[in-house]
Amino acid sequence: MRARMALAYANITIELREILLSDRPDELYTASSKGTVPVLQLPNGSVIDESFDIMKWALEQTKTDWLDINFEDQLLMIKVNDEEFKPWLNKYKYHQRHPERAYEYYQNKCVEILSKYEQTLSNNLFLFGKKPQISDVAILPLVRQFAHVDLTFFMKNLPHLNRWLETWKASTLFQSIMKKYDKWEPGQTPLIVNFNHK
């Protein structure tokens, strides 16, 4: 999601190969031995197989305005999101698989991190001020996942973060990347996509 949003914002056209993680084609492993998505193969043959790195690459091509405010602080926020928040979120989402702790324990661990965003957003439209930055879009997917576990709890306890999330969900940028595509099949006619174009 976040890689596609950056590609859309940067107005970059790609050949899209939509796959199912339950049925990963050999071509995915040919491009990246990790076998995870997203993977971006550049015209020169080099491969970017981390979503944040794809975001950064896309924005550096044409749209650097998401990178111009306290970039090092943004990187730190994204690191916490990806390395600390995500593991707690997975335990919260799938708490039945982690019975060593109560559901509320995992929820509270997530909120410890999200409350910092909540405090910031009580005074700002976005995480680093009045305009979006790469950090907003980088943490968006996991915040959205957290919200959808218990939306009533999220709306009640993190109202500013909820306002921020709803703003993004209503944006044309978010809507532009939510279209569903058919599964890619080897040998098919290439699907050329610019998410920013309707």
Mark where each language-model region is:
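A generic structural-conservation signal
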Residues: 16, 130, 177-178
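GST-like domain detector, emphasizing the conserved glutathione-binding G-site
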Residues: 1-112, 125
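Acidic/histidine-enriched, glycine/proline-rich intrinsically disordered or flexible terminal extensions
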Residues: 181-198
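A short hydrophobic/aromatic micro-motif that marks alpha-helical segments and, especially, helix-coil
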Residues: 65, 151, 186-187
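Short, flexible loop/turn segments with low-complexity composition
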Residues: 67-73, 176-185
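GST-like fold's C-terminal all-alpha helical module
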Residues: 77-170
